[in-house]
Amino acid sequence: MQLEAISITDHEYLTRLPSNDEIEIINGVEVSVSWEELEESNAYAGLHLLLYFIKKDSPVEIFLEEIRRLKEIRNLEIIDNLQNEGLDIDKSELNNFKTRVPGRPHIASILKNKGYVNSINEAFIKYLGNGKIGDSRSHQPDIKKIIELSKESKSLVFLAHPHTLMSNEKFSKSENWVNETFFSHIQDLASFGINGLESSYSSYNKSITGQISNIAKKLNLLECGGSDYHGDIKPNINLGFGYENTPIKVPYEFLEIMKEKHAQL
C-alpha cells in the first residue's frame, strides 16, 4: 500500500500545492459551521465541512477571508471571557503557535500547559464546548451558506467526522450515535446540497465506517476519508493512522468518483 493522493485541509485557510509524478494533491479546506436547527439542543460537538476542488478567486475562497476575520475576533472574545473567570491567559500567547489561524484547540493547549485542565478534551468540556464560556458558534458561518457558496464555486462539500452531529465526545468510538436521528440529520444535509460524508475517519472502527458508508449509498452521497491529524493538538492521532493505530485506508476509488462528480458541475 502506498500514498497515491492527498488533500491537506487546513481550517479556514486554503493552500494550493502542486501535484507531482508520485502524489496527486487535491486542494481543500475545512470550515467550522453552525446549524441553527440544532443550536438549542447543544447535543452536537461542533460541525465541520470539508471543501474540495476550490477554484482560485471563487466565491467560497473569497468568503474564507471573512471567516478568518471573524475567527480572530472570536479568539479574543474567548480569552476575555476566560480572563473574566479568573484564568491567567493572555492574547499574545496565541502568537506562540506555528499556525496562520489559531483556533479553540490552541486555546485549549494553553489551558492544558498552564495546568487548568489535564487534556485538550477536558478544556472543551469545561471551558470551550457548546454552552460554555468559550462557545464560538455565534461567529461561525451558517452551514447552508457554506454549502450554497460551495455550489456556486463548483466545489464539492462533505461533512467531516459525522459523529459530531450527535455526540459531545471528541472522539466517539461508541456506535450508539449511528441511529434514526443521525440518519434524519444526514437527510437534511442532503436536501441542503451536501455532496458526501467522511466515512473513513481515525476514530472509526470498521463497523462505524460501514454504517456511514451504507447511509451515503442510500442517500446517493459520495464518500471521503481522513485522519484528522492536528500534530500536538491531537497527540493521540498519528499521521496516516486510524483506529487503534492501524494505517487508515481510503480507497482511491473515492477520489475517482469525486473527480467524476466535479467534472459534471
Feature map (PLM): residue ranges:
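Glycine-rich, phosphate-binding/catalytic loops in enzymes
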Residues: I23-E24, S174-N176, F241-Y243
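Active-site gating loops and adjacent loop-to-helix segments of metal-dependent hydrolytic enzymes
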Residues: V29, S34-E72, K112-K132, L239-H262
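A metal-dependent hydrolase metal-coordination microenvironment
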Residues: M1-G103, F192, E198-L219, E223-K234
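Domain-core and long-helix interface of multi-subunit machines
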Residues: I73-L222
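Flexible, D/E/H-enriched segments
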Residues: L265
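Short acidic/His/Gly/Ser-rich catalytic and metal-binding motifs that mark active-site loops
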Residues: S167-E169, I233-N236
